Every structure is written in C-alpha cells, then in structure tokens.
C-alpha cells in the first residue's frame, strides 16, 4: 500500500511542477504581448537609415581630378576611371567614371580616401533590378541624388522604435 501512496504523491508533485512550467511559459508569452512589432511592412513603411549608412555612391563629376586613388584603395579595383592628359595645361581631364554596384561591396574606402570629396555615400539601398547590367552606373547615373524617403508621402517612415525597458 505504501508504494501506491508514494507513486500518487510523485504524480501529484510532477503535475504541480508541469503546471508551474506551463505558467512560466505563459507569463513570458504575456510579457511579449504588449510590445510593438519588430517587423515593418516594407514597401509601405521604411526605416530611416543611420547617418553612417553605406548606401549607393554619389559622384560629383566637376570635383574629380582623375587621381585614381579610389581605384587603388578599392579591394576589388572596381571604379573604372577613363581620363585623357591635356598637353596644353598638363592636367588630366576625366572622360568617364563608372561603378558596377553588382560587384561593389560598399566598403566605403573610395569615399574615405578621395582627396577632393567628390564621392559620398547616400541613403539609397534599393538597387534591385531584373538585369544585372543595369547596376553598372556611369557618371550621369552616379551624379543623380536619390529621392529622400522623407519627401515621399506614400511611405510611412519609422524613425526610432521605442526601446524595451527591462
């Protein structure tokens, strides 16, 4: 008779322990219920990028002196700089400048080491296309400034999500 009583007591203790574990899990679930969602509805909502975000490169043709520092510091020798030496003034004249964003790793070395600051990083990150050849930007495409998501009234911007207090 005693083994049956002890088994019944063990069964009761296990039931109480299981109920406690289920209750703890349920309390964790309830604590997450009052938080705001982490995900955003992407095409209609966009996060504002940080100041140091490395997006598409903007190029100012008039400032470039064709020194090719950007090509030398690029880990994959990506920027294509075509220039011609003007013999009468003994200066380089820039003919063409292009970057293929299908290959670019967005390291920012070209922007950092440019002596004339003709390169800068923008907040644009939507570079997807159906044809990879469209990602090869020449100096005209690189010179276009991206449309700011702050100016687009169809997109709801999310600046900072409220932080969770622990």
Swiss-Prot record:
Gene3D superfamilies: 3.30.70.3270
Comment on bound cofactor: Binds 2 [4Fe-4S] clusters per subunit.
Cellular localisation: Plastid, Chloroplast thylakoid membrane
Gene Ontology biological process: photosynthesis, light reaction
Cofactor: [4Fe-4S] cluster
Annotated residues for binding of [4Fe-4S] cluster 1: 64, 67, 70, 114
GO molecular function list: 4 iron, 4 sulfur cluster binding; iron ion binding; NADH dehydrogenase (ubiquinone) activity; quinone binding
Membrane topology per record: Peripheral membrane protein
Similarity remark: Belongs to the complex I 23 kDa subunit family.
Functional summary from the UniProt entry: NDH shuttles electrons from NAD(P)H:plastoquinone, via FMN and iron-sulfur (Fe-S) centers, to quinones in the photosynthetic chain and possibly in a chloroplast respiratory chain. The immediate electron acceptor for the enzyme in this species is believed to be plastoquinone. Couples the redox reaction to proton translocation, and thus conserves the redox energy in a proton gradient.
Oligomer and partners: NDH is composed of at least 16 different subunits, 5 of which are encoded in the nucleus.
Protein name: NAD(P)H-quinone oxidoreductase subunit I, chloroplastic
Gene behind the chain: ndhI
